[in-house]
Amino acid sequence: MNAVPHLGVLALQGAFREHRQRLEALGVRVTEVRRPGDLAGLQGLILPGGESTTIARLMTDFGLWQPVRDFHAAGGALWGTCAGAILLAREVLGGPPQFGGHQASLALMDLSVRRNAFGRQVDSFRVPLAVRGLAAPFPAVFIRAPVIERVGEGVDVLARHQGQIVLARQGRLLASAFHPELTPDPRLHALFLEMSLTVSA
């Protein structure tokens, strides 16, 4: 009998409960990650949408930066959605002025991401998004979304909106500018589950 897949969701701030619900609907055991010890035994970790500067500060407070890097180095998959994509990126553009334009990140994925590229919260929108590998469009919800302005050679672009990159994969890393957890469509969570099981096998 196969073991139940075990994934984590960073649960410091943002839409972590919605991610948990999507994963549990796929039969996944889910741990809410708040401290380094919570990473033990996980096959993948989702960095949710929220406020990237707040999540970054809390990651510092809870000592999570290096443990998450180590988790990935040991074979764990990572998926950043919206603010989480910012935290994965090697380069963050448009950082908060109060921090001199600097935005802390894990710097694991060869991307340049611009914060809040799609505007303010009142500019939120939902579009049917053509995603490479999916037979039908995905209902993508954008809320003050970032945009991926540059990708490195090892990064696969999976989706664009109005010509701008909004979903990309680099090995065991997945970054989405939108919020897949805010729709009942399970296909991207299923993709991340497959990534997590493949890399940890």
Swiss-Prot record:
GO cellular component: cytosol; glutaminase complex
Catalytic machinery residues: 82 (nucleophile), 179 (charge relay system), 181 (charge relay system)
Pfam families the record matches: SNO
GO MF terms held by the record: glutaminase activity; pyridoxal 5'-phosphate synthase (glutamine hydrolysing) activity
Entry EC number(s): 4.3.3.6, 3.5.1.2
Coiled coil: none
Superkingdom field: Bacteria
Ligand binding (L-glutamine): 50-52, 115, 143-144
Keyword DNA repair among record annotations: no
Role this protein plays: Catalyzes the hydrolysis of glutamine to glutamate and ammonia as part of the biosynthesis of pyridoxal 5'-phosphate. The resulting ammonia molecule is channeled to the active site of PdxS.
NCBIfam families registered for this protein in UniProt: PLP_synth_Pdx2
Quaternary structure note: In the presence of PdxS, forms a dodecamer of heterodimers. Only shows activity in the heterodimer.
Protein name as catalogued: Pyridoxal 5'-phosphate synthase subunit PdxT
